[in-house]
C-alpha cells in the first residue's frame, strides 16, 4: 500500500498553527474529503469536536471545504468521539468527522474520519483523499454548494443511546459516583447519563474554557478524582479523557482501576451470562495479571500491537467482541463500533448491579503484577535489539521469571528509544531485571 503523507494511525494530529494542523489544510482537507465522499451515498457529513478553543476554527474550515465540494454538513458542536460514530450511523451520513486530539493538551488538535457505519474510514479512501489534496481547490457551481445545518438534539440522542446500554431491570439508585469529564467533550453528557440512571453524581472536570482540557484532570491524570472519591466517601469514580473514548475508574478506597481490570470485569460478566464470544484481546502492554486471571476462568486471551486500531483489527480477525488497552480504550463490539468511555463505565456498573458487588469485589480475583518500564535512548542506525548481549540478558531474565513473569522489548515509533518492560511477582526483583536489560541495551547502542 502506498505510504500516507497526511493520515496517521488515528487521523491527522499535531500542534495548532504548525505542521499539518492549520486552517488552510483543514479547508483543503474538507474539500478533498468532499470530492471523494460525493461519488456515492447521501452526500451528507456530520462534524463533531471536543472543547479545544481551536475547534471552532477547524470546524468552520472543514465546513467551508465540504460545502465547496457540494456536500451537506450537519454540525453537532462539542460531542464525544463515540457520539460522532453513533450519530453518523443513525443519520446514515456518508461520513463523520471528529475534531479532537484526544488526551493531548489544548494546544494540539486533530482531525479523523468515520465511515458511514461508524467505523474507521477505509485506508483506501484515506489514500484517495490524500490524492485529492494534491489538486487545486475548485469550488462547485453555486446551485450545487452544500448546505449547513445543526443537529439540535444531538446531546439528547446520545444520552438516550448510552442509557439504553444499561439493563432496564436495574438502576444506579443508592450509588454515589464521582465523574471526571477532563473539561472535555463529555462535560454535558456523562454526568447526565449517570444521574438519569439514578446515581448521585459529583462532577469534576466539567467546566471547559477552551484551554483546560486534560489539564490535571481526566483519565490521564487520576490524582484529583482519587482525592475526590475519598473526600466524598463515594462508591466509585469514573474518569474520561478529552474526547470520551477512554476510561479509567477508581474504587471506594481511592485505588485506580485501569483498562486491564475493566476488561476482566466485562469478560467475567459476559461469561457468567453465557454471552461471551471467544475471548479477550489485549495488547503487548496488557498486564500479565489479566492473562493469568482469564486463564483461570478458561477465557482465551490474545495480544495485539499497542493501539486501539490494532485491538479492533484482531477482534475482527478472531470474531471476538471484547478488547482494549490498559490505558482505558475499551471496545465491546456488542455495544458500539469504537471505544466509548461512558458505555464502558455503564457496562461495569451493570455488572456491579447484576452481581450485587462492589468494584473492589469484582476485581479481587485479578492480581495485577508489578510492571516496570525503562526507556533507553540510542543513537544512530544500529538496532540494539539485534545485539547478542541484549539477547543473552533477555534470556537470562526470562529464565529467572518463569511463567509468572514477562519481558517485552520494543522500539518507540516516535523517538529513538528502546522500551524495556518487565513484569513479575516481586517489584524489587522486576526493577533489577529491567535495569539489567536496560544496561545491556545501553552498552549495545
Swiss-Prot record:
Binds 1 Mg(2+) ion per subunit. Its cofactor is Mg(2+). PROSITE patterns: PGM_PMM. It is an enzyme of class 5 (isomerase). InterPro entries: A-D-PHexomutase_a/b/a-I, A-D-PHexomutase_a/b/a-I/II/III, A-D-PHexomutase_a/b/a-II, A-D-PHexomutase_a/b/a-III, A-D-PHexomutase_C, A-D-PHexomutase_C_sf, A-D-PHexomutase_CS, Alpha-D-phosphohexomutase_SF. It catalyses: alpha-D-glucosamine 1-phosphate = D-glucosamine 6-phosphate. Its EC number is 5.4.2.10. SUPFAM superfamilies: Phosphoglucomutase, C-terminal domain, Phosphoglucomutase, first 3 domains. GO terms for biological process: carbohydrate metabolic process; peptidoglycan biosynthetic process; UDP-N-acetylglucosamine biosynthetic process. The modification Phosphoserine is found at residue 102. This is Phosphoglucosamine mutase. It comes from Shewanella putrefaciens (strain CN-32 / ATCC BAA-453). The gene is glmM.
Amino acid at each position: 500500500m502506498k505510504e500516507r503523507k497526511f493520515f496517521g494511525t488515528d487521523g491527522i494530529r499535531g500542534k495548532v498553527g504548525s505542521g499539518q494542523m492549520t486552517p488552510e489544510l483543514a479547508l483543503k482537507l474538507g474539500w478533498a474529503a468532499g470530492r471523494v465522499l460525493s461519488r456515492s451515498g447521501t452526500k451528507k457529513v456530520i462534524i463533531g469536536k471536543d472543547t479545544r478553543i481551536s475547534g471552532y476554527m477547524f470546524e468552520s474550515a472543514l465546513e467551508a471545504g465540504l460545502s465547496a465540494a457540494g456536500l451537506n454538513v450537519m454540525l453537532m458542536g462539542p460531542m464525544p468521539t463515540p457520539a460522532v460514530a453513533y450519530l453518523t450511523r443513525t443519520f446514515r451520513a456518508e461520513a463523520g468527522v471528529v475534531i479532537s486530539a484526544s488526551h493531548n493538551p489544548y494546544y494540539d488538535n486533530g482531525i479523523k474520519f468515520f465511515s458511514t457505519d461508524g467505523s474507521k474510514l477505509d485506508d483506501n479512501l484515506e489514500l484517495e483523499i490524500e490524492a485529492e489534496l494534491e489538486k487545486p481547490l475548485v469550488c462547485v457551481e453555486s446551485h450545487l454548494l452544500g448546505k449547513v445545518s445543526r443537529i439540535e438534539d444531538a446531546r439528547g440522542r446520545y444520552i438516550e443511546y448510552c442509557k439504553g446500554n444499561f439493563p432496564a431491570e436495574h438502576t444506579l439508585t443508592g450509588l454515589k459516583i464521582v465523574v471526571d469529564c477532563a473539561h472535555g467533550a463529555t462535560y454535558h453528557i456523562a454526568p447526565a447519563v449517570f444521574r438519569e440512571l439514578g446515581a448521585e453524581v459529583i462532577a469534576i472536570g466539567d467546566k471547559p474554557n477552551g484551554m483546560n482540557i486534560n489539564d490535571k484532570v481526566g483519565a490521564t491524570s487520576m490524582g484529583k478524582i482519587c482525592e475526590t472519591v475519598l473526600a466524598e466517601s463515594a462508591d466509585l469514580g469514573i474518569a474520561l479523557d478529552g474526547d470520551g473514548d477512554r476510561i479509567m475508574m477508581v474504587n471506594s478506597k481511592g485505588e485506580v482501576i485501569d483498562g486491564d481490570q475493566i476488561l476482566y470485569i466485562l469478560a467475567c460478566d459476559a461469561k457468567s451470562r453465557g454471552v461471551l464470544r471467544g475471548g479477550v484481546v489485549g495488547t503487548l502492554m496488557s498486564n500479565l495479571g489479566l492473562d493469568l486471571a482469564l486463564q483461570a476462568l478458561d477465557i482465551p486471551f490474545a495480544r495485539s500491537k499497542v493501539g486501539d486500531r490494532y485491538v479492533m483489527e484482531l477482534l475482527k480477525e478472531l470474531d471476538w467482541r471484547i478488547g482494549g488497552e490498559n490505558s482505558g480504550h475499551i471496545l465491546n463490539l456488542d455495544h458500539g463500533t469504537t471505544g466509548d468511555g461512558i458505555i464502558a463505565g455503564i457496562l461495569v456498573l451493570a455488572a456491579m448491579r447484576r452481581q450485587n458487588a462492589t468494584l473492589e469485589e469484582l476485581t479481587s480475583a485479578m492480581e495485577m503484577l508489578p510492571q516496570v518500564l525503562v526507556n533507553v535512548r540510542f543513537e544512530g542506525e544500529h538496532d540494539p535489539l539485534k545485539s547478542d548481549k541484549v539477547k543473552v540478558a533477555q534470556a537470562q531474565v526470562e529464565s529467572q521469571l518463569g511463567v509468572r513473569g514477562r519481558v517485552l522489548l520494543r522500539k518507540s515509533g516516535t523517538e529513538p528509544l528502546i522500551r524495556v518492560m518487565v513484569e513479575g511477582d516481586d517489584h524489587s526483583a522486576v526493577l533489577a531485571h529491567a535495569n539489567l536489560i536496560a544496561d545491556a541495551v545501553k552498552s549495545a547502542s
